Amino acid sequence: MDAKDVVNADQARQLVIERELSHVKVGVFDVDGVLRGKYISREKFFSALDNGFGFCDVVLGWDVKDQLYDNVAYTGWHTGYPDANVRIVPDTCRNLPLEGNALLFLGEFSDQAEQVCPRKLLQRVLTKASDMGVELFSAFEYEFFVFNETPHSVRDKNYRNMEPMAPAEFGYSMIRNSAESDTYQMLLDLAEKMDFDLEGLHEETGPGVLEAAITYKDALRSADDAALFKTFTKVALQKQNKMATFMARWSPDYPGQSGHIHLSMRDRSGKALFHDASEPHNMSQTMRQFVGGLQILMPEFLAMIAPTINSYRRLVPGYWAPTEASVGIDNRTCAIRIIPGSEKAQRLEYRIAAADANPYVILSAVIACGLWGIENDADIEVMVKGNAYDQKLPEHLHLPTNLMEAAQRFKASNIARDMLGNEFVDHFAASREWEVREFRKHISHWELERYFEII
């Protein structure tokens, strides 16, 4: 039996026994999309398959630097950071080829904690979709820069003068991917063995930047694949004394790093709901409603889509990232690109997304907004032709320009609360407000250079 064949607890036990494993890795993804976990003994794992296991809920109450939130209701010093129950999900079993024959299982928080658990959030949104008689399918595309650096060397260099894997721009280069074929093959092999297969992997425009397209799957599995791809791409490269960054934009000299999402919808019989050959661009009424919801609600939900301070460094004109809630037909300057095609190929591309977003959180936002559009008979308000950067949309389609503004819009959104729940909205908005507060404590190198001597 292989990891991808596991669908229930009995098969999970059988595979662990077959591989004679003394310990198993289990992990949960936190609010920022960081995988937190540990090795547990075989005996504890077998018990946890039936009863779950306790995991300190601090992982839902701190930031990416393990700094404790002081502004959230769910957990904190006021609760004593108790254990929260985690349910192991057998069908998330993955091989860990970088650790011999080891296995990884994902978990998800249950009971009260599930209200702020990103994976459970996506499941709730998908349950709503199922109640409406529809199923969502998606695929993530990631751009990421690779450096000839280690976690130690980048700190020694204070994140300056870092050496990229390749020296300059050379998009789609066959020279580069041949010269670096060991790295490319390592990533392709990893993806195959961990069952997040890549449809494509190529050199992008920028020094050492790659783009990976993950295979299309049902929405929950797609988010699992995306989150694991980001995590274990970093692991694999660090084992080669290299580093990958999925920051939205790491340098002012280059465009940002996208995390585009391709999305389609079917009914329970498998019929493609975005396709209607009798309509312009094969775009069905359902697709218009779905995209209308995305366009109308993008400003309110942007905190889930652009969740870091750095996210907003990417959203500037002329750098392959949208700046308004724009929609266009096969138009890569727009936030939402409608891709006409056959019944199988008709889809949308959500291009506002950056590589730094939590896959579960952003996919929850996209699907929730689209479902709202269907329920409320929304329509595309403005369709852009030509360069979206040269056109000005109505003010209500302008996007927040910083994380604090986005967090305030999200917190005040009644639609977000109806679609996602008060507990999640309050917790996530507070976590973004915390991120802004941490940033404001910081004195940048730009400020020192500008003011230290002269002012």
Functional labels for PLM-detected ranges:
Residues M1-I455:
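Glycine-rich, acidic/polar active-site loops that bind/position phosphate-bearing ligands
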